[in-house]
Amino acid sequence: MNMIRIWGGGIYEDDYFYELCDRHGIMVWQDFMFACAMYPGDPEFLENVKQEAVDNVIRLRNHPCIALWCGNNEIDAAWRGWGWKREYTQQQQERIFKAYTDVFHRLLPEVIEKYTDGDDYWPSSPMSGPEIGDHEIRPANRGDNHYWGVWHEKHKFEEYEKNIGRFISEHGFQSFPEFETVRQYTLPEDYDIESEIMSAHQRSGIGNLRIREYMGWYYQVPEDFGQMLYMSQVLQARAMRIAMETHRRHMPYCMGSLVWQLNDCWPVASWSTTDYYHNWKAAQYALREACKPVILAPQLTADSLKLWVVNDLPTPLAGTYTLEIKGFDGKLHQTRQGKYKIKANEAAPIAASSIAGLLQDNSHRETMAVITIRQGKKIVDRQNVYFALPKELLLRQPDIQIQISEEQGKKYLTATTDRLACDVMFYLPGVKAVFTDNYKDLLPGHPFRTEIRTPLSKEEIEQQIRCRWVGK
């Protein structure tokens, strides 16, 4: 991940935040603090806006992390298409829009021009261009766009492939926090996502409905409360991984993908990928993998599997790939191998196979592809591909064995399984713990290893460690 957007509905961050971004090479898309509302245009207000903008531009302008100044979040799109104009007469509309243009097309760009050395300014996100009237367009062949077909318009995850923009500056999907976070604001009698307390911590009017709808399309919907929280994160991770891999496959046409949202300001069901207590959700682990400099990005259609490699490195990459067709019990049905070459900063297909040829006589409901790309002996990336929706897979009860070890003061978990277990989440009930990797598919013959950062001793971890998996 190499860019973060400071949203116009939040705050200007403190100096230390930008210093960290400078140090770690994280570009910042900096909104001015305006979002989803029309603002006054009287002289006193405009002077207030000017002084706030000048203060923050002078404070932040020398940070190399600042990649773009953006006037506001979604106001151009909202005034154009959210029905706000219906509340006003034509004369009122003209006065309101003049105030808008005074702030975002005159005042703020003048501040940027005067107080920076040519920094880029974008009036509103999303827009198709920098001029008045350059509204967001579909298909988004210029400017930036916010894609909410998945979620608001109930598009399936597969629709990401049909909705590619040049720079997708906002897209996302909701999930609940993990059970340990939810326990901080609930009692056992509240353990229902529709309970009064849980509803108070779900500020989207369609949030629970959307989660249930999408989960029913892709997974079995659990009745257990804890499993429901967990499965919502698995669902969110699936959406965000598909989105990011799809956007990256379409480089250089698409060269930006920003996920709404990274964090929460209170413990709540939301689109965040880390919760209020900084616990990583499944989506954060998935996005870390999907945002690596070099990734496998398989593209599965009704009749074919195409292997893509995305290389964001400034140097070309060459190596070998292996495609193994396996049963969920680990039995190897066939192996295909080959070589690949990818140019610097390129996304390209390296191989394609028919589904019929891969499956042969094996059931699509209990067969998978394990694809690995290597550079020499080094594994660059590995991906699992399933030939049916998760709810259609024949997932039988796995026997997951867990070992805890301690090496040089660090504690590690190693897990093995006798058959496929999907999206396995390890956790310590009631204990604050950080797992450096989690929510992974466990396969026979492929031990999973992760570091556990917790004050608990090795023996205490052995007694308390638990796990969840899809279908449990």
Q: What does each model-found stretch correspond to?
A:
Residues 1-37, 45-68, 199, 204-237:
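Active-site-adjacent substrate/metal-binding segments within catalytic domains
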Residues 23, 39-132, 238, 277-278:
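Active-site neighborhood of glycoside hydrolase catalytic domains
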Residues 69, 76, 103, 110-113, ...:
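Substrate-binding clefts and catalytic carboxylate motifs of secreted carbohydrate-active enzymes
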Residues 303-306, 409-413:
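Structural beta-strand segments of beta-rich domains
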Residues 309-313, 414-419:
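Asparagine-centered strand-capping/turn motif at beta-strand->loop junctions
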Residues 317-322, 422-428:
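Short, hydrophobic/aromatic beta-strand segments
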Residues 324-363, 431-458:
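Intrinsically disordered, low-complexity Pro/Gly/Ser/Thr-rich segments with frequent PxxP/GP/PP motifs
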Residues 349, 354-398, 455-472:
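Terminal connector regions
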